[in-house]
Amino acid sequence: MMKKILIVDDEPNIVMSLEYAFKKQHFEVFIARDGSEALEILQHQIPDVVLLDIMMPNVDGYQTLTKIRENDSLKHTKVVFLTAKNKASDIEKGLQLGADKYLTKPFSVKKIISEILELVT
């Protein structure tokens, strides 16, 4: 069965390269530009994993993760932060809120793919 991923990031170049890479890995890919868009998609789709930026307009990644973790139907969905926020305190906060992994930008697409595959297979 095809795995589903929701990519949440406000940087179009990042979204495009990740979307392409995950489609090549036979993922069904959903895209949101911020947390509120992501939460809207999550009302209709239950992805295997959400790849989530933190610094976004409207609803940020921390708020989005909190809402995801409050939703019972998403309890099996893995959430991975992919963000430029790389201080120890940022990482600690992300993991305390319930992220399954915390990855930082800049990144290698190959590494992101392998980290995600490790979580969902």
Feature roles, as predicted:
Residues 12-30, 119:
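Two-component/phosphorelay signaling modules centered on CheY-like receiver
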Residues 19, 63, 86-103, 111-114:
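Alpha4 helix (beta4-alpha4-beta5 surface) of REC/receiver domains from two-component response regulators
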Residues 31-49:
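Acidic, metal-coordinating helix/loop segments flanking the phosphotransfer/catalytic sites
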Residues 33-37, 60-66:
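Acidic catalytic/metal-coordinating carboxylates
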Residues 46-48, 73-78:
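His-Asp phosphorelay/catalytic-motif detector in bacterial-type signaling
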Residues 56:
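Receiver (REC) domain active-site loop signature in two-component systems and cognate sites
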Residues 108:
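Receiver (REC) domain switch/active-site region of two-component response regulators
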